[in-house]
């Protein structure tokens, strides 16, 4: 399972869905441009 947009995440263990990235300073999955 991957983390969806806006979900809380850990930047050191990024489990966000493809196309998303865990923001290191706000700890939620955002669009990876």
Curated annotation (Swiss-Prot):
The keyword Secreted applies. It is found in: Secreted. One of its GO terms (cellular component) is extracellular region. Keywords: Disulfide bond, Ion channel impairing toxin, Knottin, Neurotoxin, Secreted, Toxin, Voltage-gated sodium channel impairing toxin. Voltage-gated sodium channel Nav1.7/SCN9A inhibitor. One of its GO terms (molecular function) is toxin activity. It comes from the Eukaryota. Disulfide bonds join 2-17, 9-22, 16-29. InterPro entries: Huwentoxin-1. It comes from Bumba pulcherrimaklaasi (Tarantula spider). Expressed by the venom gland. Belongs to the neurotoxin 10 (Hwtx-1) family. 22 (Htx-4) subfamily. The lineage of its organism: Eukaryota, Metazoa, Ecdysozoa, Arthropoda, Chelicerata. This is Mu-theraphotoxin-Ep1a.
């Amino acid at each position: 399972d991957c983390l969806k947009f806006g979900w809380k995440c850990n930047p050191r263990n990024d489990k966000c869905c493809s196309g998303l990235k865990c923001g290191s300073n706000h700890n939620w999955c955002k669009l990876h441009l």
